[in-house]
């Protein structure tokens, strides 16, 4: 399969218009197929925020599964979305996609040995809390974040303890508020 015929790479590189025309050429998509399972992650790596949102939405509308774990590094679509700097994102537009990913089963508590938890990736994004506010609103409305997961085996710090110590302006307060509301774990 040529690279641009591979769903992941097509979703990652193409404009929405080009991707849609290519995608419409398929009678049916087998979302269990390894190549198609990765297409949503490819869409979330598209360099254009507008194309990213449109392609991801198209794939979700047609049955893409946000709960897929990408086996290379045990990551999911949240790890992929929570990457990059504010210059690469339209957080307001992408917040709608984020909500669909979470509602569709993307695991906010999935640990990658290489990249950690999705919320660790969100904390590491090169964007201000003001930029990230739309993402925070979606994430902290969820009842299923496990703040008790140990993220540092040396110190024994949990996710909640780590995020409360974040140098960010707003995130520590949001985490404290969330932990009070859910007793630290509500999965």
Feature-to-residue mapping (PLM):
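Short helix-adjacent coil turns
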Residues: 10-19
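Intrinsically disordered, low-complexity segments enriched in glycine and mixed charged residues
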Residues: 16-17, 34, 106
């Amino acid at each position: 399969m040529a690279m641009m015929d591979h769903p992941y790479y097509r979703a990652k590189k193409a404009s929405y218009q080009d991707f849609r025309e290519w995608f419409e050429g398929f009678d049916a998509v087998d979302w269990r197929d390894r190549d198609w399972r990765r297409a949503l992650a490819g869409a979330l790596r598209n360099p254009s925020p507008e194309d990213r949102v449109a392609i991801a939405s198209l794939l979700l509308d047609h049955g893409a599964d946000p709960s897929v774990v990408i086996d290379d590094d045990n990551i999911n679509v949240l790890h992929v979305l929570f990457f990059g700097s504010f210059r690469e994102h339209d957080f307001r537009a992408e917040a709608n996609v984020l909500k669909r990913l979470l509602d569709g089963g993307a695991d906010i508590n999935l640990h990658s040995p290489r990249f950690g938890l999705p919320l660790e990736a969100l904390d590491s994004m090169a964007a201000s809390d003001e930029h990230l506010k739309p993402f925070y609103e979606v994430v902290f409305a969820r009842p299923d974040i496990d703040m008790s997961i140990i993220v540092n085996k040396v110190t024994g710090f949990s996710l909640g303890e780590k995020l409360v110590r974040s140098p960010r302006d707003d995130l520590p307060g949001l985490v404290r508020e969330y932990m009070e509301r859910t007793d630290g774990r509500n999965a």
